[in-house]
Design a protein with these regions (language model features):
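Surface-exposed cleft-lining segments at the edges of enzyme active sites
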Residues: 90-95, 157-158
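Short, solvent-exposed amphipathic alpha-helical segments in soluble enzyme
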Residues: 35-39, 102-104, 200-202
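Alpha-helical scaffold segments in soluble metabolic enzymes
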Residues: 32, 36, 104, 170-174
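Catalytic cores of processing enzymes, dominated by hydrolases/peptidases
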Residues: 126-202
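N-terminal short beta-loop-beta anion/metal-coordinating cradle
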Residues: 1-90
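Gly/Ser/Thr-rich loops at beta-strand to alpha-helix junctions
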Residues: 23-29, 92-94, 122-127, 164-165, ...
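Hydrophobic/aromatic beta-strand patches that form the interior of the parallel beta-sheet core
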Residues: 47, 84-86, 116-118, 135, ...
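Internal, conserved structured core segments that host functional sites
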Residues: 93-143
Length: 202
């Protein structure tokens, strides 16, 4: 099996859960945002994803020790809503591995009757934006209208961006095949590989 999801803590009964994904990408906007939410809410780690399909490298942590890259799923109930957060150091690089990974995540999400998916990412610009705009695309019109209501979000993405690569895009497409409403929120950021899009993440 390419990807194995290990449960590391007990999961309470959940209903109509929402999955929020923020893995590394353009400007690391999604990762910065999700990691901040996890820390702020003190979300609890429930699952760890293991795979030999991850990049053949290690990361140096705050204690100056080497550790394998990881992807984890956290949980927190907020105002009677069950929220899951998908966070990690990396995402699968190869096309087939990315598909396999997303299918495994969706299998797990469906197992506890997940209702909706939100993916977070960036739109790379040629220079850092002063006031980053947030755009969205989704696999249904209904979820676009839901998130645009009372929020300053622009859904006119056609012709502005190319394909949405990686997990953030595939979860929308594969989610549609499973009738899971899914939306991607994309913030403007500087497109340089080493740039951290903190403004966009906010």
């Amino acid at each position: 099996m390419s990807f194995k999801i290990n449960q590391v803590n007990k999961l309470p009964a959940v209903k109509d859960a929402i999955l929020i994904e923020g893995l590394p990408g353009i400007g690391n906007v999604g990762k910065i945002a999700v990691d901040f939410i996890i820390e702020n809410l003190k979300a609890k780690k429930i699952f760890e994803v293991k795979s030999k399909k991850f990049p053949n490298s290690v990361f140096i942590n705050e204690k100056n020790l080497a550790e394998l890259p990881k992807i984890e799923i956290f949980y927190k109930k907020v105002k009677n809503r069950d929220l899951f957060f998908l966070s990690g150091d990396i995402q699968p690089i190869e096309d087939e591995s990315c598909y396999d990974f997303c299918e495994k995540i969706l299998d797990t999400f469906e197992s506890f009757k997940g209702k909706e998916i939100i993916t977070l990412g960036g739109i790379g610009l040629s220079k850092p934006p002063e006031s980053p705009k947030v755009f969205c695309t989704a696999n249904t019109q209904e979820i676009i209208q839901k998130y645009k209501e009372n929020n300053n979000i622009n859904s006119n993405l056609f012709g502005l961006v190319g394909p949405i690569m990686g997990v953030s895009g595939l979860l929308l497409g594969l989610g549609k095949e499973r009738n899971i409403p899914s939306i991607s929120l994309l913030a403007e950021t500087y497109g340089h590989p080493s740039y951290l899009g903190i403004k966009g993440a906010r």
